[in-house]
Amino acid sequence: MADEKQALLPIYAATDSTSHSKPQPQAPLELKSKTHRMLARGIHLAIASLMLIGLIYGGVFSHFTSSFRGCHDGRVTSHRGVVSDRTHLFLPYLAAADKDDDKKHLVTAKHGAVACDVPACSTLGTEILKRGGSAVDASITTALCIGSINSFSSGIGGGGFMIVKPAGDENATAFNFREKAGRYAHKDMYKSNPLLSKFGGLAVAVPGIIAAVSDHEHREMREMFDWLFDEQDLPLTPGARAFRPNLAHTLDLIARNGSAAVFYDPEGPIAPNLVRTVKSTGGILTLEDFADYDVEVGPAITALFRGREVATAPNPASGPILINGLNVLGGFEKPMQAPSDFEGVATQRLVETMKWMGAGRSQLGDPVDIDNSALIKEILDPKWADMIRTNISDDNTHPWQFYSPAYEGKDPHGTAHFSVLDADGMAVSMTTTVNLLFGSLVVDPVTGIVLNNEMDDFSTPGTRNAFDLEPSIYNYIAPFKRPLSSCVPTVITDLTTQWPEFVIGAAGGSKILTSVFQAIVRKLEYGMPLLDVVRAPRIHHQLLPDVAYLEMLAPETVRNELEKRGHTVKSIAPASTMNGIYINPVSGIIHAVSDYWRKRGQADGY
């Protein structure tokens, strides 16, 4: 049993475990972080993922540990970069399973739904909705559940972005709980050894998830905790194996305190252990860095597309680029006779817009040290989209220099996304990450937390890429700065009913942005059923490399049409996952679909 536990730990563990103090339960502490009031109840329900599923699914955990070895951006490969025998994960997609059989992955509901990568977590989130919890409650529960099971891509050692949109005329709110660099971070810290931004303690930024899912109000925490941890209800069976009791104890502490203070307090039971582990593996984070962490809460950025309001996450997420892309396509008339985005001129316009989006994204970045607000304003301006549209030809593409990228685009890594809708019409779109698989490969032996390597999403000066482009000055490392992200959690509202119509987001590194962009176009431009939006092959272009990547099983005509217009086209295995919810504005019927075809996800609803 001990050997099995050790085998699941990432390779960087603190070498001096004797210096760590065992976490002890504390009285409730006051939360210093000022997050949105609607998050107050969420933590009361969220720890359900602990014993109900997250920590007893050793088989699931070990399955993904082995299956995703050598994987980047959600794509299963061997260490030589070719598709390995582990493509069994994607067989339902690669084999073009019978469409009638696929219908079982379409969930139809009347009240609420959850769509995420892990079937058990969708079910657990839906159970929270059934018990009267809000979409935020269910989202927090789902996030912690995914982090317990799929800790290779998410967890409380990471961060992310969230969009919350209540029904009615209340505006959408954006929560930025992206990880932050510490006070001693600087732009040249990886110049001598770039690998240190990926592996070990120096790659770790201050996690943000717990700050986002907590609030200073304790309320019914004790009562809800008793329900979640009633030992008579635990779904343990003879022979069941729990691999991560230290993480269970950590989540226990957070649940009992009901606030983020227990996580970030310099004198608390968690932060000192994390700082010791980070420092013992080469890092520079301090207790003050944890104490100073805050969640940025503000209005989502919005735009109109085909008569709907699109709300998504602002800079340093890639929401401004998503809005820009929709502004570009929204100015075109729908191509005549085009039944989908995979049809001649429609595909050409889609890919050309993606190339312009790739150029614009290199100018995003947290404005902590360099103010890029004027650039962001220009990117969001419909006049900028008009200029781009006049430079898109229906007949041919151009060399990458034509699109004038200012800087090298940083290529990020894997994530987890889920979408939630409750009976009151509140929608939540949330994307979380630890960056690379198992983050920095550092796990704290006391708390059981797998720590992110989000510092790798920053740019390092002094180098040029193969295209002679410098790294983006807007994404250089600076103290307390958050790195650029491809995340674009999005909620789209029908302006007639004032109810959410489409809740969408994706996981998969640089392909997140283009996947969500294509999903919105497919659903709102071409009226594709949600099942087809999620399962159909996708196309990706990020300008550099100057290649259109086409997922397997895409019609050969798509390749032919693109090559005829001068594009270089390459086939790839499925490389991103989407989980979405669509609400019919007329009937109110809810459709929820998780990406079974790429990651075996399954939605749930009631």
Indicate where each model-derived feature is located.
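Short, small/polar residue-rich loop motifs at catalytic or cofactor-binding pockets
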Residues: 297, 412-415, 437, 485-487
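Extended C-terminal subregions enriched in glycine
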Residues: 363, 367, 461, 478-482, ...
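Short, low-complexity, Lys/Arg-enriched N-terminal segments of secretory-pathway carbohydrate enzymes
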Residues: 1-39
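Noncatalytic scaffold domains of N-terminal-nucleophile
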Residues: 32, 57-308, 312-317, 363, ...
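Internal maturation/activation junctions in enzymes
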Residues: 92, 244, 266, 283, ...
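Active-site rim segments in enzyme catalytic domains, especially the processed small/beta chain
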Residues: 148-165, 169, 173, 284-286, ...
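Short beta-strand scaffold segments in enzyme catalytic cores
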Residues: 154-166, 416-420, 489-491, 577-583, ...
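Terminal signal-anchor or tail-anchor transmembrane helices
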Residues: 40-68
